UniProtKB/Swiss-Prot annotation:
UniProt keywords, alphabetically: ATP-binding, NAD, Nucleotide-binding, Nucleotidyltransferase, Pyridine nucleotide biosynthesis, Transferase
Protein's organism: Frankia casuarinae (strain DSM 45818 / CECT 9043 / HFP020203 / CcI3)
Protein known as: Probable nicotinate-nucleotide adenylyltransferase
Keyword Nucleotide-binding included in the entry's annotation: yes
Alphabetized SUPFAM superfamilies for the sequence: Nucleotidylyl transferase
EC number: 2.7.7.18
Reactions mediated catalytically: nicotinate beta-D-ribonucleotide + ATP + H(+) = deamido-NAD(+) + diphosphate
Recorded metabolic or biological pathway in which this protein acts: Cofactor biosynthesis; NAD(+) biosynthesis; deamido-NAD(+) from nicotinate D-ribonucleotide: step 1/1
Function noted in UniProt: Catalyzes the reversible adenylation of nicotinate mononucleotide (NaMN) to nicotinic acid adenine dinucleotide (NaAD).
Top EC class, one word: transferase
One of the GO biological process terms: NAD biosynthetic process
The keyword Transferase is annotated on this UniProt entry: yes
Amino acid sequence: MGGTFDPVHNGHLVAASEVAALFDLDEVVFVPSGQPWQKIHRKVSAAEDRYLMTFLATAGNPQFTVSRIEIDRGGATYTIDTLRDLRAARPDDELFFITGADALAQIFTWRDHRELFELAHFVGVNRPGYHLALDAGLPTGAVSLLEVPALAISSSDIRERVGRRAPIWYLTPDGVVRYIAKRRLYQGAS
């Protein structure tokens, strides 16, 4: 599951759990982006903070792991590089790339987007208020769309709530709430 995870929240966790159950996945690997190329004009929390928050959020589920693959690579991070690396490391595994349907709608702007569908099956998770149709020019058979239980939670909403000192309990796991407070993340985000 790829994303900025700034911060990771319960919507991400529910989506990962639902996709794992639907596709009978052995493992869901969360891959926090290193330096997301599409967010160079937006302030993004340090990669190490996003990695640690994702680790805290997923630690209780033995089916979830967190990879540093993009963080340790350095420089701008591209999904194609990550999928190539994962394919090389796991040549016999069937790879599924889980992302938000809103991100999937932009996939034709991603580097080497045609090759992406050869490396993994893409699963787009529709969030409340956003719906992507499979007829959006996406390759047949290479993409699945999934509706998950309605959790109207977004990372940007959490950052904004922290910035105005509103509670974020129950929107993201307790360990992430404490980590955000301890590191004083998102203080100026309102």
